[in-house]
Amino acid sequence: MKIIIADFQIAKYGGIVNYVKDMLKAFHELGHEVDVAQMTPTSTTQKAYDKKVAEFESGEHQRKIKFHSQAGGYEKDETVGYWYNTYYGYFLPPSNRIGVYEADAVERWKSLVSDADIILWNFMPTKSSAWDKKGVKFDFWWKFYDLPDRIKQVFLVHDAYFDMRASNVSALKDKLLFMACAHLAAYQCCANIGIPRSLLLNPRYIDEDARMPIKAMQRRTQDFFAAHMFKSMKHMEELIAAIPYLNKGVDEAFDVKIAGTGIEMNYMTSPTKTKQQYMCTLKRDPNLPKKLDGKISLWNRAVKFGMEYMGQMSGTNVQDMLFNTKFAIDPSWSDHYSKYCRTHINGFIIEAMLKGAYPVLRDYRGLSKESIENEIYDPLYENIRAIIIPWNATPKEFGLALQKAATMSPKKFLKDTLHNFELVRELFNSKKNAEEIIRLCKGGRKRVKKELECGTDSDNVRRITSDIMENFYGIELPIEWEE
């Protein structure tokens, strides 16, 4: 079979690019032909593409950008031969990167996928200025989905806000076989959309005979490591605020490294535009010495206590770091996610468990009305072996929890990390996900209707869909499909 993973371009891909990479490899290893395609607001040329690839290959691109640049950390996906990074996603040639405002854009797309069996969609146009070209209405983007029924189209859902941010997917239900949800929160929120859905957890490629790379706790020289995109939900500032308490009063400071980039990182480190929320204050930190109240940034104080910033690392370098790391930290929390789950296991934590690092996560209980009033059963939370820190922990409580974690016995560390590796092998396996997608696509609508849950478009979904499709793009609903 021929499988294409496609999207309408966005910024800030984050861990989704690793999802794509490992699914491509899984399909390829199962004997299928794979490719990547993207619809973009702007076109490119073969000359520009070749020049940039030459810079990637020679290392010139990495040498000429800033240490923390979002354009850093590019590496080559050997499965498809394209370069990618964790911020901008895949860098594609003109054959696979279609400028939607080109006169023949839809025809080029349909020619590219004419022999495809399955298309996995990551993103579609929502209410964004990126698709608002002056003088040109983008009221035809639905035509990229207007393909023959023999081509099975599946939408990949990565977001627990999907029923609000991308609810206009409901306008495409006649063309989508099902939605594949990458985590429990995404699956639960899609109950508000009238398209069948499956829970296929955020996958990683794992060889069938793979074993966890054993490296004893005492031989791992990196104490704590966190690599994330700096955005509001990640709450990297809370980890950074905890570092002075982690290293205060200890005989030998713990080694703490963080990596990643994003607009919030710029606000944390700017000498003149540091956001107030990224300053040390007694309001944030009741244990802060009064003389520091409003006088120093969280970032600068953490650096004084030993934090090291690694810039924008490639996926391979992150994995290498995790193999030498004792504790991998995800400081993120979200009141919206708390309606559906107790914690969120993202791609970084999955990578950590594959490399034998011990995860540190947040407990979402109490963040939302639903998490207080309802007993939310989260099977992943119940089964993962992790250090759990409450979402509302003070910087001192956070830091002392990390201190305590570091006293874990090597025996418990090994036992728990082996357990987590097997959990990933069983539940986050890209080959299993690929096989399930193929099985459902081969069975078609009859199998999907029989086996998968299907939600109902909520009033809110219908309202948002109408606003995006009709008011913003000028697309009359329901869509009259031509194919």
Question: Whereabouts are the PLM-identified features?
Answer:
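Short beta-strand->alpha-helix junction loop in the catalytic core
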Residues: D159-Y161, L184-A186, I195-M212, M229-K231, ...
